[in-house]
């Protein structure tokens, strides 16, 4: 019976390759997550593609980008099947695109100021906000215990998943597609971030401003902590 089921599953995968990427990935989600919140996520996959404004040619890359390491304890897969490697790649792509954007947009700013701008745009807090905006949490594959513990709303998991998505888009569609996603979702937010008191590093900004005017560094006195 188990052999028949495996053969049946393999045939289903072969048949699904003839369908659209979205339909094929829906079938994958149903096979791997029948009893998890992902069973509802497959229904909204078209909406997810629309939100990220990208359709994957190889949907297995997207599947891996959504796979948190906790999920591997459920499937027994190798640790390399989680989204951590894609997260590393996406972090590098994000850093490149953001730095390139800042270099071109602010030709008169110092390296230190640009570094501060970059730190705002690649921050985990901002990436988590973006994840919530596109509804990414409901698609992330977690094991039951991580899901019950609120993993779908945990900022670190959401931010890592956004980086993994960027890495996946880069592998599937190239740098131009990854750059498009980053510009549509991240780089335009700089002025808004600069006005956010919780995100600004005022001490660093003051120091860089002094350096830009060839002044000595500011003197700090801590009155209380």
Label for each model-derived stretch:
Residues 1-225:
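Double-stranded RNA-binding/processing signature
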